[in-house]
Amino acid sequence: PNSLPNRYCQVVDVKMYRNTFVDCTNIEFGTGKDMERTLAPEKVSFTDNIIINKGLDQPYIAVDDVAGIQFKDNKVQLAKNYSAPGFTTEKVKAPQLPDDAAIRKDKGASWFKNQVAHPAANVHKEYNVSPGTNLSEVIHSAEPGGVIILAKGTYPIQRAMFIDKPLTIRAADAANKPLVRFNGDKPDNMVTIADGGKMVIENITFDGVLEPGKALAKAGISTAFDMIQPYTLIVDGCEFQNFGEGGFFAIKGTKATFAESVTIRNCLFRDLSGDAINYAAEKDDIGRYNADDMLIENCSFYRLLGLPINIYRGGSDESTAGPYITIRHCTFVDCCNKERGSVMRLIGPQVLTVENCNFDNSGRGGATIRLDEATWEKVRIANCNLWN
């Protein structure tokens, strides 16, 4: 009621009839009610429909008042007999659904050509690298799907390792992590993921300590600006240390980039002035965000001035469903105790789980977990310990 221009109006004068729903688990009426959208649907009819689902006890979910919806002559076949005004249980012959795939070349607009090239991954190609080798050149020449194996030692890099294809970078020996250190003349990332990039990185140490006469690394792992394609990132068993500039982060997603999934597990973040994990670059508050599905588990955060985890999805636009955030089995020690700081800043995740985490002397100047959730968001925080 009294909606602002271009906002929501009440649902009225809608007819839904002669539809067949087979194994549909979410038939809902009144979805989306909040303090702005207060009027339930009116003059709506749901007539002569068929609902078949052996896994449900009732045909629909009433999220709000359904008095304005007329149910009539609907047939249902559910897990058990169901009787309600407008619904009868009958044995209904399910429609025969096609089980063959559509022929793609015969579908879609005739003028459309898919211009996105997806390089075939060569999962068998390995590249053994020793200290003194130019990592950027090895990555540039590696085939898609290649595995770059680093021997123990220090690898100074002068510019970002540019990942624009599926690649894996791992240590030859997990117990002796290779150390990557930036010594370029201009600030740059250590690793930059670009269009086409899908990266797995395992058991590598990223050291952001300042080399005399050289520039600082802007990030351990980050993204190119204004990417068109989504990417995936898996970071396992890595260490990020000695990033001494407040605006430079260990792992970061930049504005206008989007990760389908980010997995960070078994990692150590220590002695950082900036954030450890930052996916908070979309500040326009129009429903955009940097990563859709994020898993952070079994990680340790020690002596951080910045935020250990900073994820942001602003605005009230419901056309996007994410992000989905899971944080579990993580430890935070002496992290972000500055005034109004927070250990986790989690703004706008649609589904959030934080469980089995320990917070020791962290977030004392502000909040341990800072949320700004909407009524429809699913938030679970369980089995966490806090000591100060």
Describe these PLM feature segments.
Residues 1, 12-23, 42-53, 68-78, ...:
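Right-handed parallel beta-helix
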Residues 131, 165-223, 237, 242-244:
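Right-handed parallel beta-helix/beta-spiral solenoid domain characteristic of secreted/periplasmic
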Residues 1-2, 24-31, 55-62, 79-86, ...:
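Short glycine/acidic-rich loop motifs that flank beta-strands on beta-rich extracellular proteins
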